[in-house]
UniProtKB/Swiss-Prot annotation:
One of its GO terms (biological process) is formate transport. The gene is ywcJ. The chain crosses the membrane at residues 32-52, 59-79, 112-132, 156-176, 184-204, 207-227, 230-250. One of its GO terms (molecular function) is formate transmembrane transporter activity. InterPro entries: Aquaporin-like, For/NO2_transpt, For/NO2_transpt_CS. Gene3D superfamilies: Glycerol uptake facilitator protein (1.20.1080.10). GO terms for cellular component: plasma membrane. This is Uncharacterized transporter YwcJ. The keyword Cytoplasm does not apply.
């Protein structure tokens, strides 16, 4: 059933490895680009959500979830390299013995580092615009950041796990579809599902925290709070990519 899609997963992983082998700088730049794209999505989502949030409307999160979907389209079609998707791509390809686990670890670390750099860079750029100076504009973003720093590590881990399961599927399922319209709709639908569900995405959180920390924020939004969130969320994202996606589809397709 997933044969052709899994072949594409393997091809993408090997293509990424080739980019890394030929130029580590180019690979990291693609990772930086991915989190910048997510930064655009976070900006659009938080500003859209703020209009409803300030009016105490229940549509704040649904509106933000819809607009955030633009981020995955920019990554998929704009050449970004996202750590969370790579957890699936490289795990599956490594299990197929087409790439070494050592290279897999290097690729994961490089994409994660690039994503972090991109998140910080975008936060610096967006804070320089002054667009988040007014509380009426940044209140929803701060609310998101505060809310993400509150749960215990165990809950954040499982929210991260379920999130990346959906995100990996958002990249994987469209590989079996025909027509760009169907692919675009599917990707945005899956991203809407993870956002509206309250799941945690490590790279999206990087962007949320980076922007929140650079603009006027309350004492409840701290760098340590961001770190305490990102560690379990990243581990949860990694677990989903390795086990729920990479290992699962390798096991379901032993003759692939």
């Amino acid at each position: 059933m997933e044969t052709q899609a899994l072949q594409k997963v393997e091809q993408y992983a090997l293509k990424k490895q080739n980019i890394f082998a030929s130029s580590k700088i180019r690979y990291v730049l693609r990772s930086i680009l991915a989190s910048i794209f997510i930064g655009f999505g976070i900006t659009a989502a938080s500003k859209t959500g703020s209009y409803f949030f300030m009016a105490d409307s229940p549509f704040a999160f649904p509106a933000a979830a819809v607009t955030f979907g633009a981020a995955i389209l920019m990554i998929a079609y704009g050449g970004g390299d996202l750590f969370t998707g790579n957890t699936f791509y490289f795990t599956y390809t490594a299990l197929r013995k087409k790439i070494s686990w050592r290279d897999t670890l290097y690729l994961w670390m490089s994409s994660y580092a690039g994503n972090l750099i991109g998140a910080i860079l975008f936060a610096i750029l967006i804070s320089a615009t002054g667009l988040f100076e007014e509380p009426s504009v940044h209140s929803f973003l701060i609310h998101l950041a505060e809310h993400k720093m509150e749960p215990p590590a165990s809950e954040l881990f499982f929210r991260g796990m379920l999130c990346n399961w959906l995100v990996c599927l958002a990249f994987f399922i469209p590989m079996s579809l025909k027509g760009e319209g169907a692919k675009l709709f599917t990707m945005m639908l899956f991203v809407f599902c993870f956002f509206i569900s309250g799941f945690e995405h490590s790279i999206a959180n990087m962007c949320t925290f980076a922007i929140s920390l650079l603009i006027e924020h309350p004492d409840t939004v701290t760098l340590m709070g961001a770190v305490r969130n990102l560690i379990p969320v990243t581990l949860g994202n990694l677990t989903a990519g390795i086990v729920m996606m990479g290992w699962m589809y390798y096991t379901l397709n032993p003759d692939q």
